[in-house]
Amino acid sequence: MSFFFSRQSDISFLLFSESTSTTRNSSQARLLSRLAVDGSKGRAMPVLNTTRATAAASGVDATLTIRDGPVFHGTAFGANSNISGEAVFTTSLVGYPESMTDPSYRGQILVFTQPLIGNYGVPSNQRDEYGLLKYFESPHIQCAGVVVADVAEKYSHWTAVESLSEWCAREGVPVISGVDTRAIVTHLREQGSSLARISIGDEYDADEDEGFIDPGAINLVKRVSTKAPFVVSNPNATFHVALIDCGVKENILRSLVSRGASVTVFPYNYPIHKVADNFDGVFISNGPGDPTHCQETVYNLGRLMETSSVPIMGICLGHQLLALAVGAQTIKLKYGNRAHNIPALDLTTGQCHITSQNHGYAVDASTLPSEFKEYFVNLNDGSNEGMMHKTRPIFSTQFHPEAKGGPMDSSYLFDKYLENVQMYKDNSKVYRDNRPSQLMIDILSKERVGVEPSPLAANAI
């Protein structure tokens, strides 16, 4: 198998062609060398990011202003900067490092209902045997800002290396504490998710609408997706999976690689249908924002299902994009589902799973085409939580079976997906060794390439 690269716009696209030849000309070698250099940046968490870090805003007055809603006064800590975004809330009791680094929260002001946040500090950027972050879901904080009732100034945990305030200041993310989060959540539940702004120091004028940035009007996936392919390899891999990165969490990659798959991660708008037959399966990741912004991805997935019988699985935004690709529609939920304890009913078995969720949009199950059926349903609000093809190895879930944080009730779905992958590989008419060659492992970056950290202040998304 040989690998050829071509550059389209600012994205390096990887194209595969099968060949028994092991010789490569010098010009191709030089191109691969340049790509290797280009792909060596972007994923490693820096010790200090001087472009984002600010002085800690400890003890300074701060204001949370909800557009067309109440104003809450509190105390700032973390970064000394003003931001705006969509105010959403999570009822998760633990897992704030994972939640804050989840790319699905890009552009949002995250309100924690748990009264005390920060008591076990922030862990290190240690990586596992696959080169993936052990304690974070991406290298940087992804939410625009954080709102808590009370913050623990002193922390204690064997993995902790810094406080929540120090971490947020280093990452350039402002936090407001000392506010009534119960009143904030009550407003968001009754009125729906709202645009909001965190102001440090002088109170912000709520009448200045231009100060509120709406992340729903922006293609946030473009901000969090890798700009060039990279590989997460398992030296004993049985499968080779292509993953469409819409803002993939580290634990999704880990859930695949630890089960015997090597994963090649592609940009969200990569024409995956052109190379799908070189892989044993295709996976569509989670991500932030409105799925209708990703029309290129929707088109590519539609073409993929028309031209290939490769097994497909999607999670969260990946579920929504897959639904759009088959002709279904998505809807915006009033205030979304963000928690670690949401019950989802498996309609094929009648079993209930406690699931981890983080989404503001959902698939309208009534619009699913006849060849698909609803897989899971939310027992709290009746919204769709998954779909599956009636005859082909294609399924997706709205919730997160990989958790991080949250329960592992549904982690078996990764096993189900890889069983489909194994069956597809076994049934292939001509056996192909789809494991990545050593050349590919050496050349392709093991980093998420060109992903910009969450900006500051007015550019908070």
From Swiss-Prot:
Its EC number is 6.3.5.5. The keyword Nucleotide-binding applies. The active site is at 316 (nucleophile), 400, 402. It is an enzyme of class 6 (ligase). The keyword Secreted does not apply. One of its GO terms (cellular component) is carbamoyl-phosphate synthase complex. Residues 240-427 form the Glutamine amidotransferase type-1 domain. GO terms for molecular function: ATP binding; carbamoyl-phosphate synthase (glutamine-hydrolyzing) activity; glutaminase activity. It is found in: Cytoplasm. One of its GO terms (biological process) is pyrimidine nucleotide biosynthetic process. InterPro entries: CarbamoylP_synth_ssu (IPR006274), CarbamoylP_synth_ssu_N (IPR002474), CarbP_synth_ssu_N_sf (IPR036480), Class_I_gatase-like (IPR029062), CPSase_GATase1 (IPR035686), GATASE (IPR017926). Pfam families: CPSase_sm_chain, GATase. Belongs to the CarA family. Heterodimer composed of 2 chains; the small (or glutamine) chain promotes the hydrolysis of glutamine to ammonia, which is used by the large (or ammonia) chain to synthesize carbamoyl phosphate. HAMAP family: CPSase_S_chain. This is Carbamoyl phosphate synthase arginine-specific small chain. It comes from Chaetomium globosum (strain ATCC 6205 / CBS 148.51 / DSM 1962 / NBRC 6347 / NRRL 1970) (Soil fungus). The lineage of its organism: Eukaryota, Fungi, Dikarya, Ascomycota, Pezizomycotina. The gene is CPA1.
